[in-house]
Amino acid sequence: VKALVKLKVISKKEALTIQKGLNSILNDNKKGRLKFSKKNEDIHMNVESFLNKKIGNVANKIHTGRSRNDQVATDTRLWTIKASKNLQEEIKNLMKSILNQARGNEKTIIPGFTHLQVAQPVSLAHHLIAYLEMFKRDLNYFDFCINNSDENVLGSAALAGSNYNLDISLLNKSLHFSKSKNNSMDGVSDRDFCMYFLHASSLTATHLSKLSSELILWSSNFMKLFNISSEYSTGSSIMPQKRNPDSLELVRSKTNSIRIKSIELSNIVSNLPLTYFKDFQEDKRIIFDCYDELISCIKIMEKVIKKSNFEKSIGRDLCNNYFATATDLADYLVIEKKIPFRDSYKIIADIVNYAQKKNKNLSQIKIDEYQKFQKSIDKNIYKYVDINNSLLRKKTPMSSNPKDVSRVIKKYIKFLRVR
């Protein structure tokens, strides 16, 4: 409307009338008063019809210089920017809940797993920070989505551009775009920004599914590392002793449909020559559904993390019972006894096999038993058996050493405060 005023296609008085009419239609829609007609083909023509009834023939001027093609492309870009920012806010809320669980647990021992086998001791905080890293990448991906959606398409018209000398800078400023399209044909046909949105959503969904699966596993009777809040678990209809992590299972299930949506839209747009087709009507359904499902999953996960608790004592027992410091013992032989690592590996493997047969953990094996496998072993080996020392011994900055974990936690506190 502002651009048409500048071109003197409509007067300032007519522009004010049009704006009041459009605001009235918006208010009617919020109150459910609008009755759409199939005779008007689509939402654009329905709105124009509503406006005509409210303000008369001046409504017939608003379509000057534009097409439904460039209008819907612009509207979709504006929606994608807003949706991406909303998702970023919910992801940050989830990250804050994860961070709050990590704080104070820099020295809380849990087993780190590979192949679902107890591998090495880590801290609960270190494990949770891994998810902060994932969700931080998701924030960055949505930044990428916002940047690629931030292109004004108005002026492309149907496909060839507009015959009216529209002030594109004015349009950009009015709609809060930082730039405009260079090519009108690409302007009306480009749905890459929708694909980026779906890809980013798919990646976030993947991380949510991963976290859900892990917490479900941790809440099982076999691990008991995670106690899910009763608000987000349900009882069995027949077995009174059970609590089921239904909320997490539903998040895990719903993330599958989110990930499929990027494939669905890709299949639609890959078959289309330039420029505009009715096929594009489907992109709204896909991205709207994706958004609704993803934001609900993030919100549920945030509440589950916030209101549940992690078991702080069982992790240590799991590490002891499943020889989690075996690698530390191999390093002991390398560092203190100068035995090549591959030879050290074999010696400790034999010791672990011996301990399993004797139903002992590594701290329960006596020094004379250790010396049966390597005579040079002395009492210093017990320093390497100790799980706390395993964390403290880590040297690299990305390690599970409590000092490094605390440093990273401080970084995330600052990151979430300023972002």
Residue ranges, per PLM feature:
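Short linear loop/turn motifs
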Residues: 17-20, 185-190, 347-351, 386-389
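Short, well-ordered beta-strand elements within core beta-sheets of diverse protein domains
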Residues: 1-10, 123-126, 193-203, 328-338
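Structural signal for hydrophobic packing residues in well-ordered secondary-structure cores
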Residues: 22-33, 51, 55-59, 84-109, ...
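A helix-coil-helix interface module used to build multimeric assemblies
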Residues: 1-161, 166-172, 232-236, 246-250, ...
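Charged, flexible cofactor/metal-binding loops and thiol motifs
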Residues: 77-81, 110-111, 117-271, 278, ...
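A generic secondary-structure micro-motif detector
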Residues: 37, 121, 187, 319-320, ...
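Glycine-rich cofactor/substrate-binding loops
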Residues: 49, 54-58, 222, 239-419
